[in-house]
């Protein structure tokens, strides 16, 4: 039986999800078909009896949005990554992949993703200094006293969007999404393969980290392989134009009924997406309004914790491998960063480093 606390927790995560969906739309992903991913996620939670929901993650959108040169490549990256992760989860290989890479290398990779997020935020601010700067100032002003990411994203997006409308006197003149059911056939090229592998590597780390955190909040066992299966299957909705959804740190984990609260959150977002309201709302929310939030989660919420996990009490080879993984990820992408870190972890002891 759902309680008021369950409903409030779900609503809080919904408020966090709406700006992320608008952010995804700025890269060409479509709102209505993204509802399919949320429904698949809810069905997966119900089928496996887990407490770990999925939603749009800023890091995922920033990675896919920047690695894909156009919407065809972005959708293809999400689809192929979804296939990879669904297979890995179904075979129960997620922990084996983590063990092979090494937890410090994976943590270094995730810290590198934090730097990528900060770089995307800075590029957004450069593209629109007025909106981006207001978003950044608001995000910092809210995050420092509260350390609450939901308040941070809502405040920074609302304030910077209001400033944009005050300055321009009218919403953006963009075409409102008119979705018709259609299949976007995935393409295959070097960029797509690299992007799919990069997203898969990022998903391995986030599923283990975020899945364990949310399950820990609920006092439940974290079935990461199950999470990997249904988050991977949810991303197959990108074949219809949907944005990819991934594991998140969800406040629903702290609700009295975390499973039901998580399912309610995803179904609510699916209904909002199908209603067609978000594409209309997106005319009033410039892409750069999310810049402050991206900077905060990159610099303050992602880099410090993962860098600490990567380097704290590390042996010399582990230290070098984590540093390589972090640096190369920040300069290229998570897949190349992970591979570079693994190579250093293997050869460093042989070379006596």
Describe these PLM feature segments.
Residues 12, 202-203, 317:
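Alpha-helical transmembrane segments of multi-pass membrane transport proteins
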Residues 2-15, 32:
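N-terminal amphipathic alpha-helix initiation
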Residues 8-9, 219-220, 265, 310-313:
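Short, motif-level signal for alpha-helix interfacial/capping segments enriched in acidic residues
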Residues 7, 19-44, 179-258:
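Membrane-embedded helical hairpins/re-entrant loop segments and their flanking transmembrane helices
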Residues 1-5, 163-192, 351-353:
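Intrinsically disordered, low-complexity non-transmembrane regions of multi-pass membrane transporters
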Residues 15-16, 206, 320:
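Residue-level signal for transmembrane alpha-helical positions in Major Facilitator Superfamily
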Residues 68-174, 266-353:
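Membrane-embedded alpha-helical modules
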Residues 9-20, 41-98, 102, 223-304:
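Helix-loop-helix junctions within the multi-pass membrane cores of secondary transporters/permeases
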